[in-house]
Swiss-Prot record:
Changing E199A: Large decrease in affinity for NAD(+). NCBIfam families: PRK05396.1, tdh. Pathway: Amino-acid degradation; L-threonine degradation via oxydo-reductase pathway; glycine from L-threonine: step 1/2. It is an enzyme of class 1 (oxidoreductase). Changing E152C: 120-fold decrease in catalytic efficiency. Zn(2+) 2 binds at C97, C100, C103, C111. Transmembrane segments: none annotated. Zn(2+) 1 binds at C42, H67, E68. This is L-threonine 3-dehydrogenase. The active site is at T44, H47. It is found in: Cytoplasm. The gene is tdh. PANTHER family: L-THREONINE 3-DEHYDROGENASE (PTHR43401:SF2).
């Protein structure tokens, strides 16, 4: 193994990132070193690249970016048990304390002292990465790296879609970005019908149809609530899944969901949102779930089994694959323009 590696690094505050050569890190106690086989770009990585207000408050350059990964364990630090060199793995990004009130109740996904791998630590946009052993997930060999790297965001989609009954339910999904597209795949694999998708981008509406959406709506040109009511014989959808983070989409979805329906919210909003709580939530007796992270480790088992079932239609979602990191700037600019689904760097 070489002593040097290439990595995409946020070297300083400001727009962009740099491809640099750095030392291969060494795993410390309770850590493992993985060789990266595939890694994918998340919206969080784009925020760091663009250096938005959140990134400015959270990221401390110089730092290697990236957190979605499939890799192979190549070295084990002191005190690590249950993991071996050669294991094919992915990484849960929430580094939890195990001691706070939430953790002691088994609610690790809302740990009060969470650190995020690849946000608060160096990440996986590199040939090698050091990972806390407690965050390692072992993959079946049958799952290819370009799918295995998607398990972390797939976990977000699974928790959103499967927060309540979904088989045989009518569903409205607002937002067909990468997470929304994964939500479509999970909903279809889980027996939802019809799956209706509201998305303003022509490119993403086409992707939504390829993934399996039964109906697509352009919210800039069509009345979303009217279209949903027409499709559902005036009843509204059983389940509303909000992936966009757009306040208008939230309002439309709450109007379009049937009384006593279920709502799952994953999209993050730009600020405070004004909602008619009385008429859109209370009098409709809606059940609402806020979604963050993934349930450790229940969601990972669900994601892995869905992948092994072969029922998830992920190929249309992976719109761009790059061999190595050389074209990382092109990849990020395409994502900024909304011209991608998931972008994967292949290092195998």
């Amino acid at each position: 193994m070489s002593e040097k590696m290439v990595a995409i690094m946020k070297t300083k505050p400001g727009y962009g990132a740099e491809l640099v050569e750095v030392d291969v890190p060494k795993p410390g106690p309770g850590e493992v070193l993985i060789k990266v086989l595939a890694t994918s770009i998340c919206g969080t990585d784009l925020h760091i690249y663009e250096w938005n207000e959140w990134a400015q408050s959270r990221i401390k350059p110089p730092q290697i970016m990236g957190h979605e990964v499939a890799g192979e364990v190549v070295e084990i630090g002191p005190g690590v048990e249950g993991i071996e060199v050669g294991d094919y793995v992915s990484v849960e990004t929430h580094i939890v304390c195990g001691k706070c009130y939430a953790c002691r109740r088994g609610q690790y996904h809302v740990c009060q002292n969470t650190k995020i791998f690849g946000v608060d630590t160096d990440g996986v946009f590199a040939e090698y990465a050091v990972v806390p052993a407690q965050n390692i997930w072992k993959n079946p060999k049958s799952i290819p790296p370009e799918y295995a790297t998607l398990q972390e965001p797939l976990g977000n989609a699974v928790d959103t879609v499967l927060a309540g009954p979904i088989s045989g339910k009518s569903v409205l999904i607002t937002g067909a970005g990468p997470l929304g597209l994964l939500g479509i795949a999970v909903a279809k694999a889980s027996g939802a019908y019809p799956v209706i998708v509201s998305e303003p981008s022509d490119f993403r509406r086409e992707l939504a149809k390829k993934v399996g959406a039964d109906y697509v709506i352009n919210p800039f040109e069509e009345d979303v609530v009217k279209e949903v009511m027409d499709i559902t014989d005036g009843n509204g959808v059983d389940v509303f899944l909000e992936f966009s983070g757009a306040p208008k989409a939230l309002e439309q979805g709450l109007q379009a969901v049937t009384p006593a329906g279920r709502v799952s919210l994953l999209g993050l909003y730009p600020g405070k949102v004004t909602i008619d709580f009385n008429n859109l939530i209370i009098f409709k007796a809606l059940t609402i779930y806020g979604i963050t992270g993934r349930h450790l480790w229940e969601t990972w088992y669900t994601v892995s089994r869905l992948l092994q079932s072969g029922k998830l239609n992920l190929d249309p979602i992976i719109t761009h694959k790059y061999k190595g990191f050389d074209k990382y700037e092109e990849a990020f600019e395409l994502m900024r323009a909304g011209k991608t689904g998931k972008v994967v760097f292949m290092l195998k």
